[in-house]
């Protein structure tokens, strides 16, 4: 005699089994109304045929990649007339639609030669296979997971030759007994040309319009383009000191002045690794609007951010436009001992200053540096050549005099003695600072 607890447990288990059996029965009945045990009324129709026709009018294209690419539009068919209780498998393959190799010329596809040998026949088996006829008939059969590739790598992918036209075929095979082919169906509107990249822009636009996954890529591209557009104005805006980076390459104009008169050099030479070169990246990533006439060297003199001094140097450059000078204008290095200066400079000197006295350099140095009489006639003022030593200029002296008084053997009637007197009067001795 069974206890009440055992009877209740058996009833609850039966209820659970009945629920499962009922679910299976409902699943089988879902497509049975379209079934035909004789399979005489079997029909296979293409889903979204209007969309396929729009692509066919433009000559549809499908991407093939090494790793495989899914199709769009997705191949879907609706089936009716199968035996609801029989088992079937659905297969898909692709056949050549013609005997041509195609090429895209002047906005249209034209035959481009003989086709390549056909790849080994690849067949895609629908992942729901095998299954009851009722299962296949209850909803459209979608081949959304099939991938097209141009490499023979297996993995259930379909290998196609690029620039060849193909047509998909769907096969229905009855299984679970004597296996036999029931039917094969193909749809001309699903023909396409396999490509590694879309050729027709209209095909690209149509796929983006109707493919929900392509819209995600399009939105990402639009965001990327918008970000680039937002960054471009910031890149094109250059700081106010950028023009000095073009005029004075290899030096930074943001450094504090080491000497109130940088055109005469400094008492202490700074190494090339000085902190003045702390903004090199600003110049390296900025394109110069004009080719720079200066040759960059490591041992370059230090320049201050003294705007009047920079402007005076730029004004003197205006008169050098007609000269093809390979080197820099002369500068005046200062030496506080009898020995010659040891610090190298990218500016060759026409004047040698020793113990506060300025003596004219050799004319050969001027000629070797490309500074002839035409250079001195183009200077802002004209002065007679100096044949005797003069004192170094004071702090109030103009930096323009350094180049104008460098000619030693030039004789010209336009030079007068009054100008020489004014020049000597404005130059005062300079005593070097104690070391």
Swiss-Prot record:
CDD domains reported in the protein's UniProt record: T-box_TBXT
Organs and tissues of expression: Detected in testis, but not in other, normal tissues. Detected in lung tumors (at protein level).
DNA-binding region, residues: 51-219
Record GO terms (molecular function): DNA-binding transcription factor activity; DNA-binding transcription factor activity, RNA polymerase II-specific; RNA polymerase II cis-regulatory region sequence-specific DNA binding; RNA polymerase II-specific DNA-binding transcription factor binding; sequence-specific double-stranded DNA binding; transcription corepressor activity
Ranges for region Disordered: 279-308
SMART domains, A to Z: TBOX (SM00425)
This protein's UniProt keywords: Activator, Developmental protein, Disease variant, DNA-binding, Nucleus, Transcription, Transcription regulation
Cellular component annotations (GO), alphabetically ordered: chromatin; nucleoplasm; nucleus
Subunit structure: Monomer.
Protein name stated in the entry: T-box transcription factor T
């Amino acid at each position: 005699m069974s206890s009440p607890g055992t009877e209740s447990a058996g009833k609850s288990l039966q209820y659970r089994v009945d629920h499962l059996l009922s679910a299976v029965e409902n699943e089988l009945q879902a497509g049975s109304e379209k079934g035909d045990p004789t399979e005489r009324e079997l029909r296979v129709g293409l889903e979204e045929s209007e969309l396929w026709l729009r692509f066919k009018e433009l000559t549809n294209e499908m991407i093939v990649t090494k790793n495989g690419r899914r199709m769009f539009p997705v191949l879907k068919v609706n089936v009716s007339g199968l035996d609801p209780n029989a088992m079937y498998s659905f297969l898909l393959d692709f056949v050549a639609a013609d005997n041509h190799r195609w090429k895209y010329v002047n906005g249209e596809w034209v035959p481009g030669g003989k086709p390549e040998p056909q790849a080994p026949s690849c067949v895609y088996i629908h992942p729901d296979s095998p299954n009851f006829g009722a299962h296949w008939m209850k909803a459209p059969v979608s081949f959304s997971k099939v991938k097209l590739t141009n490499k023979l790598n297996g993995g259930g992918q379909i290998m196609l030759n690029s620039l060849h036209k193909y047509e998909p075929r769907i096969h229905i095979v009855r299984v679970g007994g004597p296996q036999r082919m029931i039917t094969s169906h193909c749809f001309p509107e699903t023909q396409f040309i396999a490509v590694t990249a879309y050729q027709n822009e209209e095909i690209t636009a149509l796929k983006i319009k109707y493919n929900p996954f392509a819209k995600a890529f399009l939105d990402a591209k639009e965001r990327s383009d918008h970000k680039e557009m937002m960054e471009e104005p910031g890149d094109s805006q250059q700081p106010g000191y950028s023009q000095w980076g073009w005029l004075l390459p290899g030096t930074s104009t943001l450094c504090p002045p080491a000497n109130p008169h940088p055109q005469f050099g400094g008492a202490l030479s700074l190494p090339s690794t000085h902190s003045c070169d702390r903004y090199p990246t600003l110049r390296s990533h900025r394109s110069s609007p004009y080719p720079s006439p200066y040759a960059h060297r490591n041992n370059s003199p230090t320049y201050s951010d003294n705007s009047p001094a920079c402007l005076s140097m730029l004004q003197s450059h205006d008169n050098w436009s007609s000269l093809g000078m390979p080197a820099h204008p002369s500068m005046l290095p200062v030496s506080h001992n009898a020995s010659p200066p040891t610090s190298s400079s990218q500016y060759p000197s026409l004047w040698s200053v020793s113990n506060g006295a300025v003596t004219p350099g050799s004319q050969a140095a001027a000629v070797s540096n490309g500074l002839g009489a035409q250079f001195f006639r183009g200077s802002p003022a004209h002065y007679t050549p100096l044949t005797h030593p003069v004192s170094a200029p004071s702090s109030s002296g103009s930096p323009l005099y350094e180049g104008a008084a460098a000619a030693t053997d030039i004789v010209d009637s336009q030079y007068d003695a009054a100008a020489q007197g004014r020049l000597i009067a404005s130059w005062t001795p300079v005593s070097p600072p104690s070391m």
